[in-house]
Regions:
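ABC transporter nucleotide-binding domains
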Residues: 2-137
Length: 137
Protein backbone atom coordinates (compact mmCIF):
# COMPACT_ATOMS: atom_id res chain seq x y z
CA UNK A 1 0.00 0.00 0.00
CA UNK A 2 1.26 3.48 -0.85
CA UNK A 3 1.52 5.62 2.28
CA UNK A 4 2.15 8.77 0.23
CA UNK A 5 0.75 9.35 -3.26
CA UNK A 6 1.11 12.50 -5.34
CA UNK A 7 -0.74 12.88 -8.63
CA UNK A 8 0.30 15.89 -10.74
CA UNK A 9 0.56 17.99 -7.58
CA UNK A 10 1.22 21.62 -8.47
CA UNK A 11 1.82 24.77 -6.47
CA UNK A 12 2.30 28.19 -8.04
CA UNK A 13 2.97 31.45 -6.26
CA UNK A 14 1.41 33.91 -8.69
CA UNK A 15 3.48 33.56 -11.84
CA UNK A 16 6.31 31.79 -10.00
CA UNK A 17 6.43 28.02 -9.99
CA UNK A 18 6.66 26.17 -6.69
CA UNK A 19 6.31 22.60 -7.93
CA UNK A 20 4.86 21.47 -11.25
CA UNK A 21 2.83 18.27 -11.77
CA UNK A 22 4.80 16.23 -9.24
CA UNK A 23 3.80 12.56 -9.35
CA UNK A 24 5.26 9.77 -7.23
CA UNK A 25 4.34 7.33 -4.49
CA UNK A 26 6.07 5.95 -1.41
CA UNK A 27 5.21 2.41 -0.43
CA UNK A 28 4.94 1.21 3.15
CA UNK A 29 8.38 0.24 4.42
CA UNK A 30 10.30 2.35 1.90
CA UNK A 31 12.81 4.91 3.06
CA UNK A 32 12.43 8.22 1.27
CA UNK A 33 14.11 11.58 1.60
CA UNK A 34 13.71 14.97 -0.02
CA UNK A 35 17.06 16.16 -1.35
CA UNK A 36 17.92 18.91 -3.80
CA UNK A 37 19.18 22.45 -4.11
CA UNK A 38 17.50 25.51 -2.62
CA UNK A 39 14.30 26.28 -4.48
CA UNK A 40 13.79 22.72 -5.74
CA UNK A 41 10.42 22.42 -3.98
CA UNK A 42 11.27 20.16 -1.03
CA UNK A 43 9.67 22.31 1.67
CA UNK A 44 6.79 23.26 -0.60
CA UNK A 45 5.97 19.59 -1.17
CA UNK A 46 6.07 18.77 2.54
CA UNK A 47 3.92 21.79 3.41
CA UNK A 48 1.42 20.75 0.74
CA UNK A 49 1.26 17.21 2.11
CA UNK A 50 0.38 18.62 5.54
CA UNK A 51 -2.06 21.14 4.01
CA UNK A 52 -0.13 24.03 5.55
CA UNK A 53 -0.37 25.57 2.07
CA UNK A 54 -2.93 24.70 -0.59
CA UNK A 55 -2.23 23.10 -3.97
CA UNK A 56 -2.90 25.00 -7.17
CA UNK A 57 -3.73 21.75 -8.98
CA UNK A 58 -3.39 18.01 -8.67
CA UNK A 59 -3.99 15.83 -5.65
CA UNK A 60 -2.20 13.84 -2.99
CA UNK A 61 -2.93 11.32 -0.27
CA UNK A 62 -1.11 10.45 2.94
CA UNK A 63 -2.08 7.15 4.60
CA UNK A 64 -4.86 6.96 1.98
CA UNK A 65 -6.34 10.27 3.14
CA UNK A 66 -6.80 13.31 0.90
CA UNK A 67 -4.41 16.11 1.89
CA UNK A 68 -7.12 18.78 1.69
CA UNK A 69 -10.27 17.02 2.84
CA UNK A 70 -8.61 14.92 5.57
CA UNK A 71 -5.81 17.27 6.64
CA UNK A 72 -6.73 17.22 10.34
CA UNK A 73 -6.43 13.43 10.45
CA UNK A 74 -3.12 13.53 8.58
CA UNK A 75 -1.63 16.15 10.90
CA UNK A 76 -2.81 14.17 13.93
CA UNK A 77 -0.95 11.10 12.68
CA UNK A 78 2.26 12.79 11.49
CA UNK A 79 4.88 15.22 12.71
CA UNK A 80 6.65 18.06 10.98
CA UNK A 81 9.83 19.73 12.13
CA UNK A 82 10.97 22.56 9.87
CA UNK A 83 14.69 23.06 9.43
CA UNK A 84 14.65 26.50 11.01
CA UNK A 85 13.34 25.85 14.53
CA UNK A 86 13.88 28.22 17.45
CA UNK A 87 13.27 27.41 21.10
CA UNK A 88 13.49 29.29 24.36
CA UNK A 89 17.06 28.59 25.43
CA UNK A 90 16.19 28.52 29.15
CA UNK A 91 13.45 25.95 28.60
CA UNK A 92 14.28 22.39 29.62
CA UNK A 93 13.63 19.36 27.43
CA UNK A 94 10.80 18.17 29.71
CA UNK A 95 9.20 21.63 29.61
CA UNK A 96 9.25 21.66 25.82
CA UNK A 97 7.69 18.19 25.61
CA UNK A 98 4.97 19.17 28.09
CA UNK A 99 4.33 22.38 26.16
CA UNK A 100 4.08 20.48 22.86
CA UNK A 101 1.81 17.81 24.35
CA UNK A 102 -0.49 20.58 25.57
CA UNK A 103 -1.38 21.43 21.97
CA UNK A 104 -3.02 18.04 21.67
CA UNK A 105 -4.27 17.70 25.24
CA UNK A 106 -2.33 14.44 25.60
CA UNK A 107 0.25 14.85 28.33
CA UNK A 108 1.51 11.41 29.34
CA UNK A 109 4.53 11.65 31.66
CA UNK A 110 5.37 7.94 31.32
CA UNK A 111 5.34 8.14 27.53
CA UNK A 112 7.47 11.28 27.68
CA UNK A 113 10.06 9.50 29.82
CA UNK A 114 10.08 6.44 27.53
CA UNK A 115 10.53 8.66 24.48
CA UNK A 116 13.38 10.59 26.12
CA UNK A 117 15.07 7.32 27.07
CA UNK A 118 14.67 5.94 23.57
CA UNK A 119 16.19 9.11 22.07
CA UNK A 120 18.87 9.36 24.79
CA UNK A 121 17.64 12.80 25.86
CA UNK A 122 18.16 14.21 29.34
CA UNK A 123 14.80 15.74 30.31
CA UNK A 124 16.47 18.05 32.83
CA UNK A 125 18.86 19.69 30.34
CA UNK A 126 18.25 23.15 28.98
CA UNK A 127 17.58 23.44 25.26
CA UNK A 128 20.56 25.82 24.94
CA UNK A 129 22.86 23.07 26.24
CA UNK A 130 21.83 20.52 23.60
CA UNK A 131 23.73 19.83 20.39
CA UNK A 132 22.03 20.77 17.13
CA UNK A 133 21.24 17.10 16.50
CA UNK A 134 19.64 16.64 19.91
CA UNK A 135 17.55 19.78 19.44
CA UNK A 136 16.17 18.24 16.26
CA UNK A 137 15.22 15.02 18.10
Amino acid sequence: MAIVELNRLTKRYGKRRGIEELTFSIEEGEIFGFIGPNGAGKSTTIRLLLNLIHPTAGSAKVFGKDIVRDSRDIRRDTGYLPSEVHYYDDMKVADLLRYSAGFHGKLDENRMRRLAERLALDLSRKIADLSFGNRKK
